[in-house]
Structures are given as structure tokens and as C-alpha cells.
């Protein structure tokens, strides 16, 4: 259903198997540092791991790491990755957090930095961003009580993935849920969404779907059976 658009970066990445940070931290790094590159204050971009650090009694250490995220140098990347490890303490709960201390080596740093550069080039073509790190206030239910999205442009709801693979059914269902929750939320910005999109800076590829092409039966099932909105 999605239209596939390869982008133009000819500079290849090192193999994913060479990276010294796990995929979840790589994804968070590209997400948060792309926001920083586009003008979001570092403290705002990293507010989730900062909260997680406070929840596990590491707030002072996290602040020291944040103070070292000043640019896109290797030293800043190391500090950012250490700080991002606290993200899980906020999202999953402090009881599930275990320190990992993942530090990027040269190959990993190159990949992370290149993926941020690809993300900036992507937004030069598909942007500008009108909202990042958005929530679905008013759209949550007893079944889905939390969640936030990546980026919203004028008419497209975007999800960033740094997987080595193409979007799978779980990813597409998640994006559909985000769109439907957005329409049930208090935020008018979602009323302008006409397309759902994935951008994968590792593959440097875009996938786009007009929401008018989504089967109405799938939309109804998502609304009522998955998210839990009442039927009229």
C-alpha cells in the first residue's frame, strides 16, 4: 500500500553489526539529535531520559552528561548515548531499568552522525516540521494509556525507524493507531494529516500512504477493537 521513495545519499554506512550501541539507543539518538539539529533546545529534546535519570536517583549525573552534549562531536555523541540509556527508566518504569553504559566507537559514531545528516536532508525535502515529540492528549483509552509520535509536517504524520529492514506490519499498525488517536485527541493539528509516512535514515528511504487509501473496515477495527473507542 505504501509508495516507496529511495533518497539520494551515496555515502554508505558501516554494517549495523559493527555498531556498539543497541538499535533502540541508535534510534533515540537519531530522533533526539535530529531535533537538536533543527533547533530544539538540547534540554527539551532529552527531557524523557532526564526524567528517567531522576526516577532512578541519577539526576545529577544526567545533568553532567547533558552539559557535554554541545555539538555533534564524538565527545557529545558519547555523552548523549550515556544519557539516552535513562530513557527506558521513564518510558517503562524505573523498576525495569538496568544500566548498560553503551559508548559509540568510531564506526558507530560515523553511522549515527550520517543518519542525522540524512534526516536533516530528508526534512529539507519533506518538511518543514510543524510539531515533534507530539502526544495524543484526549485520545488515550483504557487499552492505550500512553504513547508519543516522532514528527508532524503540514500534511503527514511521520515515524522514524533505523532498522535494517523495510517497515513491517507491526510498524504500519502502530502508525495507523497514532493517526486515529490523533484524530480523537484535543489537538487540531491532526485534522490536517492526509498521509502517513516512514523515514528510515539507515536505509535512506521513504514510504508514504495517502490515508484515503486505507480500507474503512481496517479503520473501524483499529478504532473500536484495538484502541477501544466506543461505537456510535
Model-derived features: where do they sit?
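An acidic intrinsically disordered interaction segment
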Residues: 133-152, 212-215, 219-230
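Conserved catalytic cores of phosphodiester-cleaving nucleases, focusing on short active-site segments
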Residues: 149-164
Amino acid at each position: 500500500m505504501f509508495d516507496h521513495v529511495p533518497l539520494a545519499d551515496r555515502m554508505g554506512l558501516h554494517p549495523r553489526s559493527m555498531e556498539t550501541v543497541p538499535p533502540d539507543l541508535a534510534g533515540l539518538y537519531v530522533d533526539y539529535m535530529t531535533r537538536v539539529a533543527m533547533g530544539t533546545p538540547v534540554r527539551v529534546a532529552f527531557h524523557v531520559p532526564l526524567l528517567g535519570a531522576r526516577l532512578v536517583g541519577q539526576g545529577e549525573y544526567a545533568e553532567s552528561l547533558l552539559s557535554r552534549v554541545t555539538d555533534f562531536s564524538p565527545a557529545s555523541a558519547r555523552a548523549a548515548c550515556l544519557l539516552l540509556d535513562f530513557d527506558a527508566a521513564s518510558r517503562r518504569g524505573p523498576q525495569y531499568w538496568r544500566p548498560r553504559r553503551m559508548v559509540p566507537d568510531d564506526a558507530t559514531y560515523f553511522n549515527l552522525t550520517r543518519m542525522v545528516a540524512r534526516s536533516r536532508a530528508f526534512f529539507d525535502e519533506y518538511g518543514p516540521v510543524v510539531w515533534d515529540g507530539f502526544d495524543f492528549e484526549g485520545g488515550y483509552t483504557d487499552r492505550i494509556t500512553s504513547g508519543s509520535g516522532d514528527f508532524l509536517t503540514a500534511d503527514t504524520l511521520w515515524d522514524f525507524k533505523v532498522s535494517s529492514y523495510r517497515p513491517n506490519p507491526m510498524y504500519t499498525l502502530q502508525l495507523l493507531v497514532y493517526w486515529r488517536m490523533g484524530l480523537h485527541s484535543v489537538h487540531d493539528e491532526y485534522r490536517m494529516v492526509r498521509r502517513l509516512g516512514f523515514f528510515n535514515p539507515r536505509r535512506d528511504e521513504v514510504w508514504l500512504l495517502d490515508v484515503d487509501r486505507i480500507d474503512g473496515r481496517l479503520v473501524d477495527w483499529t478504532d473500536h477493537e484495538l484502541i477501544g473507542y466506543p461505537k456510535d
